[in-house]
């Protein structure tokens, strides 16, 4: 099996294509939803061990927002879209037409709005991956959680069962007046991970 380091180093262009297409689609969708012009930075894309996700996104005790889904059809596993609280609050305030400095706890309507945005962004990346691999990837109904990063990162194993050792992580930054930081994380089962690499034309 090719190592993660080899995948990340030798096939950087293939991974970047997933990130660029997904982020481009996500930017357009979010801009339409918010009614704003949104700029996008170049996404950072890598495969990494599942146990390294926590340290890659920041402090484990930081409160973040996570939108989580299962995936099925040609591949099995789970996926998440994670945002820091400031980014999530900014998006919700825009959608609800509130002042930018509104900082109350999220109510059910707010969480529903966050979930919808997360679903759109995650779906954009899934579509990019599906288009480049030729695989059919079907997401389940999403759910949203607001908690410490360590707690949210433990949810996929509890909700969706076992998954493989490796994850695809895409860090994306959008900006209008405020920078919005987000992480798309796909955690395929081991057999599905191999299927993704093979479908991208990467040797196993």
Which sequence ranges carry the predicted segments?
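Composition-driven recognition of glycine/serine/threonine/acidic- and proline-rich low-complexity segments
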Residues: 2-204
């Amino acid at each position: 099996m090719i190592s993660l380091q080899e995948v990340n180093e030798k096939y950087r262009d293939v991974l970047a294509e997933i990130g660029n297409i997904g982020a481009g689609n996500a930017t357009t969708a979010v801009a339409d939803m918010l009614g704003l012009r949104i700029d996008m930075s170049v996404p950072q894309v890598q495969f990494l061990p599942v146990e390294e996700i926590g340290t890659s996104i920041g402090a484990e005790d930081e409160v973040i927002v996570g939108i989580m889904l299962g995936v099925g059809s040609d591949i099995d596993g789970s996926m998440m879209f994670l945002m820091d609280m400031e980014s999530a609050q900014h998006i919700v305030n825009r959608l609800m037409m509130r002042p930018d400095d509104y900082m109350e706890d999220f109510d059910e309507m707010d969480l529903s709005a966050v979930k919808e945005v997360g679903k759109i962004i995650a779906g954009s990346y899934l579509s990019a991956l599906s288009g480049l691999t030729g695989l059919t990837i079907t997401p389940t109904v999403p759910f949203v959680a607001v908690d410490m990063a360590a707690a949210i990162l433990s949810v996929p194993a509890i909700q969706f069962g076992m998954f493989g050792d490796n994850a695809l992580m895409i860090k994306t930054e959008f900006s209008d007046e405020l920078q919005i930081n987000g992480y798309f994380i796909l955690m395929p089962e081991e057999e599905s991970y191999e299927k993704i690499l093979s479908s991208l034309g990467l040797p196993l």
